[in-house]
């Protein structure tokens, strides 16, 4: 099916209640999945631009724009190499890191042959270089990174089949699986260290993590056992429809709470526009 032409809108607020939107990226293609990165002097917006008419046939490119004054934005340029998609850049030890996925396999390749996720590093948020390959195959894509301390990095990966989270030690050249493998896929993963606890969110099915809300899809909240990689379910975020949901963003606020944003949409219907709301909530860590 054909894909729509989206653009990237940034919203700002001084009280997290009243928001002012403005467009920061609008190319001739379908712009989607924006990610923010704040450095000392700039605010970067990375977004995936889908090139082509068909969703399955379209190729991707990550574009970047930035501001130094909060009002004027640079023209979007390629953030890295054509075909790579950035997922949630992180600041660590004076530099910036991002997991970038690319699929260079031919269309006829099997699921096991599709996909590769690489770890990239930048000193300024604009120029990136490859550090290592995090994983390959199994249609790997969206990968959330969380730094535990001065030497440990965990990657939680969206794949067609389930896989254990991976861990790497500085300088992050090699990756090893943690012991536990979840019994569900990690769709739209988001992980953050809040105090000394890793909180994690992804899209889940209510048949596995049941509640009394409508529909079948949920934005699940978990705590991670960093020794084993096990994800302990805590609760599901509120939903109006249980249709198209998730893609959370988690912002730690001190050591005992976090802001979490996610979208809550009506069930997908081919060729029809459906309502989708952005939700914002506070999680208190006990």
Where do the PLM segments sit?
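Signature of short aromatic-glycine-proline-rich micro-motifs recurring in repeat-based ectodomains
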Residues: 247-249
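Beta-rich carbohydrate-recognition and catalytic domains
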Residues: 1-32, 37-188, 192-243, 253-259, ...
